[in-house]
Amino acid sequence: FVKTMMRLMKERTTLNVVSDQIGRPTYAKDLAIATIKIVNEVSDGKKIKGIYHFANKGVTSWFKFAQQIKKNAGLSCDLLPINTAQFPTPAKRPAYSVLDTQKIETTINIDIPSWEESLLACQKMLG
């Protein structure tokens, strides 16, 4: 999403972005770090059972996420909020898809960064 939005914001003067789908954007690098920590804990003999959700801290819409991408990159494309019905996709998307990360934070003792921090790190990595 980040790479695509940055590319489209450079190519276009206006971009429509869905504003009524809420979630927790997740940086793959943060997920990989959490996964490695879990593997290390299991290797050290810790019993870990059940389902654990991971996502960066904070909640946002795709539109607000795109606004932050634009701000971080210093781009000038106009972003227009639209609703899900105005942007049909083959797969139905949930309006609210926020994962609860309390279990992984407390059981594995993982400090999860905010999506804003991780987005900035991702954009710096992308160049």
Put a short name on every predicted segment:
Residues 1-23, 29-36:
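NAD(P)-dependent short-chain dehydrogenase/reductase
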Residues 41-90:
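Mid/C-terminal beta-alpha module of Rossmann-like enzyme folds, strongest
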